Amino acid sequence: MSKIKEAFQNGKAFIPFITCGDPDLETTKKIVRAMAANGADLIELGIPFSDPTAEGPVIQEANIRALKNHITTDDVFEMVKELRQELSLPLVFMTYANVIFSYGTGRQTAGAGGAGLPAETAAVGAAGGANAPAQALCGIEGFAARAAECGINGIILPDVPFEEREEFAPVFRKYGIDLISMIAPTSHTRIRTIAEKAEGFVYVVSSLGVTGIRQNITTDLGAMVALVREANPEIPCAIGFGIATPEQAERMGKIADGVIVGSAIVKQIGTLGTKAPEVIGAYTKEMKEASNRFFIDE
């Protein structure tokens, strides 16, 4: 069983998301520790990027704040490496294709892969392949190698359609990293097709559009989850996009194997800044309990 699937063995999984470097990396580390200590089963880490197309205003603004702090992809890798020395729960990156393509090539723009490596180092990595040190590789291979070296268990790429996943999946698989599929409301055939190749868990998108807090979630999520389970009985399903309240978490916990919350957490961080860790820890505990209320009652 993969490390990510293990996260779904402790009742209904609660999966929080944060943008790394907002308001700063030290606070990010404190928040991650607080979430882990208060029941988070898996944590999604957003790498700051200048064009996060799947994100709504709340997470877009968090990316802007992190980039103003000059946070690079390598800074995030170093943070994960430090956290991994004390935390055993699965850690998953949520990022974008350009961050990966540009990693280590020396051509990164702001928020697209970090400070990069000298051109001659990138050339050595390109020639050395899997035998080269992680820091000497570039592009998909370099990113995957460094992520594995730092202790990342999975990756979510919201701007990469299913038809293009094979450009990434074999490389990440080689380094023991699950490429997690997202399934939005779509045809039954497409849901089954995506589910059949899913790794780690399936991220079921509650609503079409970008991330953000929603008052009402009207999609027939039960039917979507049922289709996923029919196509791939072994893969856990977690629902995200729009979940913010304990009541919503309880409702989603009745349907799926896990609940994902991002914008509601990032919004609190944007308001509280360096005072956020304690509040986010308490919120994590509340949402984990709510996600499992129906499960425990059963």
For each predicted feature, which ranges?
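Glycine-rich phosphate-binding active-site loops on the catalytic face of alpha/beta enzymes
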Residues: 45-50, 155-156, 161-164, 206-213, ...
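N-terminal amphipathic alpha-helix/helix-capping segment at the start of soluble metabolic enzymes
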Residues: 1-17, 80
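Active-site beta->alpha loop and helix N-cap motifs at the rims of alpha/beta catalytic domains
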Residues: 47-49, 61-108, 136-157
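Active-site-adjacent beta->alpha loops and helix N-cap segments on the catalytic face
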Residues: 2-5, 51-57, 71-78, 138, ...
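Alpha/beta catalytic cores of nucleotide-metabolism and tRNA/nucleoside-modifying enzymes
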Residues: 227-235, 244-250, 254-298
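Catalytic cores of alpha/beta
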Residues: 28-33, 187-195, 243-259
